[in-house]
Amino acid sequence: MKTFLGLCLLVYADMILVPALAQAATNTTSNDAPAHETKATIEGLVRDIACPIQNLEATATHLSMKCLRACAKAGSPLVIPTMDGELYVPISDKMPDTDQRRKLMPFLGKYVRASGTVYARKGTHAIAINNIEELKGVRLNIEDQ
């Protein structure tokens, strides 16, 4: 099971770099389809990517700060999972893409509202964040500090 979950993480990491990869094997449509782009605001928990992918018990409001800090320190990409189960990867609005970790690190383990340009392509979601703020009224289930 751990091998399978590890493989899932590797596949998702590839999806960050090549968004169409996840459906390429099962989808016969062109991988060159343009991404859908819109201005939007999302709300979710800033966390590392490993836990929501590998831990099937993970939710948008439940986390271990000890694990989160260790994964972030080790370089795990940061993402924003929402209450409805969507996972948003932060990207730059310019090419080449620049590191968005600096923008998210102050919000690690916090529930946020992020506004910007949202991109969707074949089930993968990304956001070029223009504005981000912590939402204080969300009850988080934090296992440890």
PLM regions and their residue ranges:
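Bacterial N-terminal signal peptides
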Residues: K2, G6-A20
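OB-fold and OB-like single-stranded nucleic-acid-recognition modules
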Residues: A22-Q145
